[in-house]
Amino acid sequence: MAEGVVSFGVQKLWALLNRESERLNGIDEQVDGLKRQLRGLQSLLKDADAKKHGSDRVRNFLEDVKDLVFDAEDIIESYVLNKLRGEGKGVKNHVRRLACFLTDRHKVASDIEGITKRISKVIGEMQSLGIQQQIIDGGRSLSLQDIQREIRQTFPNSSESDLVGVEQSVEELVGPMVEIDNIQVVSISGMGGIGKTTLARQIFHHDLVRRHFDGFAWVCVSQQFTQKHVWQRILQELRPHDGEILQMDEYTIQGKLFQLLETGRYLVVLDDVWKEEDWDRIKEVFPRKRGWKMLLTSRNEGVGLHADPTCLSFRARILNPKESWKLFERIVPRRNETEYEEMEAIGKEMVTYCGGLPLAVKVLGGLLANKHTASEWKRVSENIGAQIVGKSCLDDNSLNSVYRILSLSYEDLPTDLKHCFLYLAHFPEDYKIKTRTLYSYWAAEGIYDGLTILDSGEDYLEELVRRNLVIAEKSNLSWRLKLCQMHDMMREVCISKAKVENFLQIIKVPTSTSTIIAQSPSRSRRLTVHSGKAFHILGHKKKVRSLLVLGLKEDLWIQSASRFQSLPLLRVLDLSSVKFEGGKLPSSIGGLIHLRFLSLHQAVVSHLPSTIRNLKLMLYLNLHVAIGVPVHVPNVLKEMLELRYLSLPLDMHDKTKLELGDLVNLEYLWCFSTQHSSVTDLLRMTKLRFFGVSFSERCTFENLSSSLRQFRKLETLSFIYSRKTYMVDYVGEFVLDFIHLKKLSLGVHLSKIPDQHQLPPHIAHIYLLFCHMEEDPMPILEKLLHLKSVELRRKAFIGRRMVCSKGGFPQLRALQISEQSELEEWIVEEGSMPCLRDLIIHSCEKLEELPDGLKYVTSLKELKIEGMKREWKEKLVGEDYYKVQHIPDVQFFNCDDEQRE
């Protein structure tokens, strides 16, 4: 558990020492001594990894090592950064700088020697206490494999007394299993405890399945297995009366099994396959010739797709509230009639906490089954948050079984993914995490593999999603993950792990017993503030590396610059929505020289100090502050050469001039203003993927186009509307032929939409607002073959008639027509928009009626009508009902009153 975090820290420190070797000259001897100790530590960590469970001494050892590694990294990086600040200062200060440098070097050498001695002492104490022998021999502590073997035993037995919510899933999978020959592998994935094995059992014993196949085998693979054992079990299941199987060698078993599967119709269930590599180890016995079929369960969706890219991949779903309560009532039948209503209310609250996880509901039911009064239930409810994932003080092993099963998914993670997972403990319950921000948090912590931050972070998140540790739905319209969050149960596991690791401290005004504060808060290097009223509790925590202020529901004012001075080692600082006294960001922010991430998103600030020039390591800088007064931004951002993400204020002082040409590593640049920066600054920003620009009077698209041509990797382009936005009008040079561009927003004046050949060939999403187009844009837009969504917002089109032609918009999924004040008639021809699923009509006061041709758009699933005349609703539930009768979900908002059809 902790060793993952510690190993990650050692790897980062080692990389830092190698990367900055030239700047560490003069203290070579001390650095070499530190490296020798790190080698020893790394070997010990490898030993500890296999035998760490059940030993407080091992955990304490790892915690000491983690502190030492962090301290060493802080010392080295501070020295390097201070040395960088002294370079290029001119001759005048040379002598003074030299004296300071010699003093710094002497101090750093002494500090490194101190760290080295501390490491040596820890190793010595470890040996004297016998911990090293325990690590090697294992003592009596349980290994992960022991725990795995103890709790993970599954059988094909069909007896399930508490089945709820699986009937539909069974029917969805049984059909393809017996009727579609081309489907050879069916994969069921989902988080631990969600009911994958239960669902597989029901399919395994279904009457249709039993009639269809000639033989059946069920094998639980789990984490620890041998190739021979799995093959042997399958063959035994298919040939139960063959007594010679146990005496066969591996080669013979492989041949017999291959021949058997090749000649008959057999169903093989591989339950709980953890890794793609596990499939690779056992796949040789499965012939290519079809006839046999496989049902595979895994926490990792990628395992099934790896086994067969054409497999039927099915995600087990959580129970809805009604199903959860139904399951709970089967386990805890009604007994106490006099207190039933009170107990029902308490019980439903606790069941909701289980988040639809069947195993959690069953465990909770088992805990309450022998408690017959409301007061007993209330006591359990008050402690359920901590107890359902912690070491239960109650004599009920089932609580620990839930924790251990869910924990196995965490234990299986590689070192860097463990770090990614633990970072999610920062966020409040049900918090929607913006993925792009999350990736930058990770990168600022050193979880960054050298690709772009976006690609690197997306790889990590998708792996966590595949392992069912994180929920992140990709909508039909998006090509990237936008938001993610944790299932409540998994979040509690995450927080529990972070607590054991001293990974972070959560600060908030205690409101319930579920509030979790890290053990030994003084050793925690990360803080997250969930309440503005708790901000003063920060105190002086000089070793803290990250501070996130999240989910503020009240005003948080920062009045004192000392807040920053007391946190000199910060790498991550998120002050979104914070208010600064006098609108000024304190100049002491410049002392946070280690800072990689700074967010002032929607913060109340109008003046940035020039001291931010000292933040040389900055990767992510969000200055998209709350709109109010123009913001003073000093021309020092050009010195942040490591920047990958930069979001500027939408409104800056008229005299602001920013030179950004040296920021060649930018992947994301938003609110770039042609008034405050030169378009020539863009020429070398060839890594940009997301770009938002606002025009000034002195710049037209033609001026900008030469720089835009350099953006060959661009995915999102936005011409941002503001009161200062100005464009003479559409010009013939308007060509946006970026092959990777998926999303285009136009907030500028155009008399007509550019022609089809002037727009990106693979564009998927177009948003138009304040364009004041006089010509109908639909004849052009409907020819874009890859277009999935179109939004026409405030005065995008000022004409009276709009037509969607037959055969147009072949892939369009979503259409929004909003605040088109002059639109009177909209015609939809039969055969237009054959894939449209979602339609929104909003505040088009002159639009007389819904198109008659909408009745031909049979793919429509949802229609929202908002801010329209009352007659619209009356007609659509009356004489015009034929236009919408095929749409499952029709909603009216602010047309009179809300109504759902």
From Swiss-Prot:
CDD domains: RX-CC_like. One of its GO terms (biological process) is defense response to other organism. ATP binds at residues 190-197, 385-392. SUPFAM superfamilies: L domain-like, P-loop containing nucleoside triphosphate hydrolases. InterPro entries: Apaf_helical, LRR_dom_sf, LRR_R13L4/SHOC2-like, NB-ARC, P-loop_NTPase, RX-like_CC, Rx_N, WH-like_DNA-bd_sf. Residues 15-56 form a coiled coil. Residues 144-453 form the NB-ARC domain. GO terms for molecular function: ADP binding; ATP binding. LRR repeats lie at residues 567-591, 592-615, 833-858. Keywords: ATP-binding, Coiled coil, Leucine-rich repeat, Nucleotide-binding, Plant defense, Repeat. The LRR repeats probably act as specificity determinant of pathogen recognition. Belongs to the disease resistance NB-LRR family. RPP8/HRT subfamily. Disease resistance protein. This is Disease resistance RPP8-like protein 3. The gene is RPP8L3.
